[in-house]
Amino acid sequence: MVEADRPGKLFIGGLNTETNEKALETVFGKYGRIVEVLLIKDRETNKSRGFAFVTFESPADAKDAARDMNGKSLDGKAIKVEQATKPSFERGRHGPPPPPRSRGPPRGFGAGRGGSGGTRGPPSRGGHMDDGGYSMNFNMSSSRGPLPVKRGPPPRSGGPSPKRSAPSGLVRSSSGMGGRAPLSRGRDSYGGPPRREPLPSRRDVYLSPRDDGYSTKDSYSSRDYPSSRDTRDYAPPPRDYTYRDYGHSSSRDDYPSRGYGDRDGYGRDRDYSDHPSGGSYRDSYESYGNSRSAPLTRGPPPSYGGSSRYDDYSSSRDGYGGSRDSYSSSRSDLYSSCDRVGRQERGLPPSVERGYPSSRDSYSSSSRGAPRGAGPGGSRSDRGGGRSRY
């Protein structure tokens, strides 16, 4: 592709290597005023490469000089004089530099692509950071089937700001297990367990579907129950036991329980804020103990559909509901005995249940009875919660 250089610029080729700028200026200066004489030299040897460019102030003078001097001899060599085009070397220097430059931007784009790869890199690096968040998110929310869809925001926030999303992914994805971010309110006060909790949840997920069924059952059974006054009264000691000794199982069950409590929007957040961790931790632990037997005594593990779940609990509410007088004594006996029977049926030695500190037994009797019967019925009315469950 031959482009004409600027008007008034002449290309002089076939020069003797001895010809210099002064000789050119002398020869061509008689046609008009010369603006520039450019003798092309070898970079290394600094010798003339045999051609030059002479730029006249007036394009008309350049045309005259080209017409007269083309083919004439200069310093013993016939020279070629014509309107300068952007020669290949100069295209190489100016033209191709745009290609290099234009290739540069593609390289920049490649860098842009690589850059997006780069930006993809940091998020993926963040992703690795987040892999903690994501894998937790996966594990925890995978223990509750549909939630990963709802947990979409943590991954999205994970993309742009991995560092932020890793913690929020932690809290939110661990709350993702429960299904709602609001529990991060309740849960932030327990900064420890959410981080420890992914492992149990992973254990839940992969241990057996039945166990997971039970843990969801726990979450619902204990969902209704942490609101009983008994659990709040007894909260502090069991919190010490469950948080320290049974942290995994209790925290595992606690978070589903509080997750579902929060998810159902029954104001459980307030219940939890009333007795922040003790009740629900202990309760979830109790429900964990019970869940292994209670589902057996109640029937099949809950289906994951909402209606049967609520039917189950509404029936359990009706079945075990009533005044605190009735459930506090008889129901506690019933459930503690059911617990032992269920453990024996499942092949768990009864001693497992008795092996925990004695305070747990005393609390388990009251809370095991109290939550079951009292959750919606006794304790809610007792707490003056005139709100209808539904």
Swiss-Prot record:
Keyword Ubl conjugation recorded: yes
Record SMART domains: RRM, RRM_1
Ranges annotated as biased composition (Low complexity): 158-169, 323-339, 354-371
Every RRM domain range: 8-86
Keywords: Isopeptide bond, mRNA processing, mRNA splicing, Nucleus, Phosphoprotein, Ribonucleoprotein, RNA-binding, Ubl conjugation
Gene Ontology MF term list: RNA binding
Top-level taxonomic group: Eukaryota
Composition bias type Basic and acidic residues, residue spans: 62-80, 194-215, 241-274, 380-390
One Gene Ontology cellular component: spliceosomal complex
Cross-link Glycyl lysine isopeptide (Lys-Gly) (interchain with G-Cter in SUMO2) residue location(s): 80
GO biological process: mRNA processing; positive regulation of mRNA splicing, via spliceosome; RNA splicing
A Pfam entry, by short name: RBM1CTR
Main location: nucleus
Keyword Metal-binding on entry: no
Subcellular location(s) of the protein: Nucleus
Phosphoserine sites (modified residues): 88, 161
Biased segments, Gly residues type: 107-120
CDD domains (alphabetical): RRM_RBMX_like
Annotated stretches, region: Disordered: 62-390
Note: According to some authors, RBMXL1 is a RBMX retrogene on chromosome X which is likely to be functional.
Primary role: RNA-binding protein which may be involved in pre-mRNA splicing.
Protein name (Swiss-Prot/TrEMBL): RNA binding motif protein, X-linked-like-1
Organism: Homo sapiens
Origin organism lineage: Eukaryota, Metazoa, Chordata, Craniata, Vertebrata
Record gene name: RBMXL1
